A protein has these predicted regions:
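Short His/Asp/Glu-rich catalytic/ion-coordination signatures at enzyme active sites or charged loops
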Residues: 36-51, 100-119, 141-184, 245-284, ...
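Short charge-dense sequence patches
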Residues: 33-39, 67-77, 110-116, 129-143, ...
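Generic detector of short, well-ordered, non-transmembrane alpha-helical segments enriched
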Residues: 16-18, 48, 393
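Active-site-proximal, well-structured secondary-structure segments within enzyme catalytic domains
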Residues: 159, 188-191, 198, 202-245, ...
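N-terminal helix-rich structural modules
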Residues: 23-222, 227
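Gram-negative bacterial Sec-dependent N-terminal signal peptides
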Residues: 2-22
Length: 472
């Protein structure tokens, strides 16, 4: 080997050693016994995109080993060695997936989308392997068949029944051929759900209305106009432009107050037709979802997907669910008709020369309210600033339930807009961590919801894990 080749080989070895050392030095927070933070809140600033997939793969491997230990256990299946053991399995996977799921919906990015696309089929396949495992299901069924003769508590019996039902609904009773078909359908659905949500978020962020004539802003509150001006600046537009988006704080005031009817129509149609055409058209995706769901229902012995979904809830069948909806729908339609009649009368009185259309509803509802009750919602708005509302809710919680919410300004948070609270019981002991994240942004899906970033449990050995809840 000549000197150049020897030098090149040495460089390659050195580079490889350096990379290996760097990988070894890199600590994956998800794979540590504890995060080392207050109440074990995820250390968001220390979590890298590169941490998720290795942690998920290791979590899946750990869960598979834990499930295999249940399967090979020669002891007679009982609640502890089967049902409880399954519930305790996969805690590493749950740990990382809860954080990933939370951030994917509240602080999305192209990197998170790429990770989601890679892990979704892996998670789907791994779950199916467990739920359709005949040896594991045999143990579950053994406990289920003897549940009333084992001295179990009512809660334990319910747990056994729910577990058995979950396995059956996941395909545990199917033939090998149908199991294989169901696995394919589940993989397809996981991809379709990803595509649907990706299109929805992309279409929401792509839509905007640019106004460059201040006359078109007539009727809008100053706060709404200022917000639109800020949005225009963020979009790189010069002064004298205003940008309105589909995010609720931008969309709703426009529909409610804008005197420009064409502006209201444009916003309304943009919202109701979201992701219905163009680059982010969800029409074909929805069509594929409907067909895949129908196939899944048929494999599991149901006439349609609605029957599959309602069979395990209080309604029990689609007819009962529809009947409940109609009990609300019919009087609601009647009331809306009465409201629209009032709106039309007011429009006629003002000489508007229009027939009330859907994009007029919020606007004329506000006009009727002012006309009938002299109530200006924009004047009331000042009393309902987010900090005031949050403080009021916390005060009510303390008076009703004795719990206190104490802000933790130094606690880890996944976005600067997030506030973190220590939830204390009446005796001052720690109950939970509560995070609030109430403002819209391009990286967050629309809507309002809550979820757990960390679940709660009490193990038989007395180990307690308190929940970390986020409210969006």
């Amino acid at each position: 080997m000549n000197m150049k080749k020897m030098a090149l080989a040495a460089c390659i070895v050195a580079a490889g050693s350096f990379a290996a050392s760097a990988d070894q030095a890199r600590v994956n927070p998800f794979l540590q016994p504890s995060y080392g933070t207050v109440y074990d809140i995820p250390p968001f600033e220390s979590i890298s995109y590169d941490d998720y997939i290795p942690a998920i793969r290791q979590g899946i491997a750990e869960r598979e080993a834990e499930i295999q230990a249940i399967i090979v256990n020669r002891a007679t299946p009982d609640f502890d060695n089967t049902i409880l053991a399954m519930e305790k399995a996969g805690r590493t996977l749950s740990r990382v997936m809860r954080v990933f799921g939370a951030l994917n919906e509240t602080d999305n990015s192209p990197e998170m989308e790429a990770i989601n696309a890679e892990i979704s089929p892996i998670i789907s396949a791994a779950s199916d392997e467990i739920m359709m495992n005949p040896q594991l299901f045999a143990k579950v069924k053994s406990v289920y068949d003897r549940r009333n003769d084992m001295g179990l508590s009512p809660a334990q019996i319910k747990d056994v029944e729910d577990t058995y039902t979950e396995f059956v609904r996941a395909g545990a009773l199917l033939s090998d051929t149908d199991k294989a078909a169901l696995k394919e359908v589940n993989l397809k659905l996981s991809d379709l759900y990803l595509a649907f949500n990706r299109n929805l978020l992309s279409a929401t962020n792509a839509f905007r209305i640019v106004v460059n004539d201040p006359k078109r802003l007539s009727g809008l509150p100053e706060s709404s106009v200022a917000q639109a001006a800020d949005a225009a600046r963020e979009a790189g537009l010069p002064e004298g432009n205003w940008v309105f988006t589909l995010q609720a704080p931008s969309r709703l005031p426009l529909l409610q107050y804008a005197d420009d009817r064409e502006l209201r129509r444009e916003m309304y149609e943009g919202y109701v037709n979201l992701a219905s055409s163009g680059e982010y058209n969800n029409g074909p995706v929805i069509n594929d979802i409907v067909h895949a769901r129908a196939r899944k229902a048929a494999l599991l012995g149901y006439p349609d997907y609605a029957s599959y979904m309602t069979a395990n809830v209080m309604a029990k069948n689609p007819a009962a669910a529809e009947d409940l909806l109609m009990q609300i729908w019919r009087p609601a339609v009647k009331r809306v008709g009465e409201e629209v009649a009032e709106m039309q009368a007011l429009a006629d009185k003002e000489g508007a020369g229009i027939t009330i259309a859907p994009h007029d509803y919020y606007y004329y509802a506000e006009k009727v309210r002012r006309d009938k009750y002299a109530l200006d919602e924009d004047e009331v708005r000042a009393y309902f600033a987010i900090d005031n509302v949050r403080k009021g809710i916390f005060t009510m919680a303390e008076k009703l339930y004795g719990v206190k919410f104490v802000e933790m300004p130094e606690a880890p948070k996944y976005h600067p807009e997030v506030k973190v609270y220590d939830v204390l019981d009446t005796d001052g002991s720690h109950l939970a961590v509560f995070m609030t994240d109430y403002f819209p942004r391009a990286s967050k899906r629309q809507g309002a919801w809550m979820d757990e970033m960390q679940g709660s449990f009490v193990d038989p050995d007395g180990t307690v894990q308190r929940p970390i809840v986020f409210n969006v």
